[in-house]
Design a protein with these regions (language model features):
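N-terminal export signals
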Residues: 20-43
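Short hydrophobic segments within beta-strands
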Residues: 55-57, 157
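Catalytic-core regions built around general acid/base machinery
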Residues: 138-151
Length: 199
């Protein structure tokens, strides 16, 4: 799912010629009171810009948050993953599975260390070192801590990852907690809802 298309490639696909793009950048440079020689420099920087990497981890969840985003209309899922972000890992909709999926996750975290957005849906079970929910033999709590190290920010999608949700309800047999109870040193944005939809 890793995207390699740059903004320059997308503009070319839309029929914007390199000449027109350079002219636009030179005009923009002059409007910003920069010398005309900055036009090509701006063009190179813009054309090489990649979409932000997104790693989406599902923990104790029902997949309702993922289902809700696959049915979104503004933007559509296609626009989101092909034009706005590079959805490098999301096991529900990705083709890879097993060891291949684990390799994709490891590569995405390594290649984008410090720059990727980490999206989490589902609460994190803590009882018995998180053994009640594992992916690829790794507990959710260990996976979250590892992925959070290289994340620029964490986005909690749904009430479960934001506040613990249904898994945290009494008697809470897995000792489910929200992401913020585990990760304290990263910016976290909570988007609660079950699922988070606009109406």
């Amino acid at each position: 799912m890793s995207a390699t298309r740059t903004i320059g490639q997308r503009l070319a696909e839309e029929g914007v010629s390199r000449r027109a793009f350079l002219k636009f950048c030179t005009t923009l440079a002059s409007m910003m009171a920069l010398p005309p020689s900055m036009g090509p420099v701006m063009a190179q920087a813009i054309a090489a810009k990649r979409r932000p990497s997104v790693i989406w981890l599902p923990f104790q969840e029902c997949t309702g948050c993922t289902e809700s985003i696959t049915r979104s209309g503004t933007p559509t899922l296609e626009t989101l993953i092909f034009d706005l972000v590079s959805l490098d890992y999301q096991e529900t909709i990705m083709a890879a599975a097993g060891h291949q999926a684990e390799g994709v996750l490891a590569a995405a975290m390594k290649e984008n260390f410090g720059k990727y957005l980490l999206i989490v849906d589902g609460s994190v079970p803590l009882i018995e070192d998180g053994a009640y929910s594992c992916i690829g033999g790794q507990s959710n709590v260990a996976m979250l801590k590892e992925a959070a190290k290289g994340a620029a920010a964490i986005i909690c999608v749904g009430t479960c990852s934001s506040y613990g949700g249904i898994p945290k309800a009494d008697p809470n047999p897995t000792q489910a907690v929200p992401v913020s109870a585990v990760i304290k040193d990263k910016p976290i944005v909570n988007i609660p809802g079950c699922p988070p939809i606009r109406w």
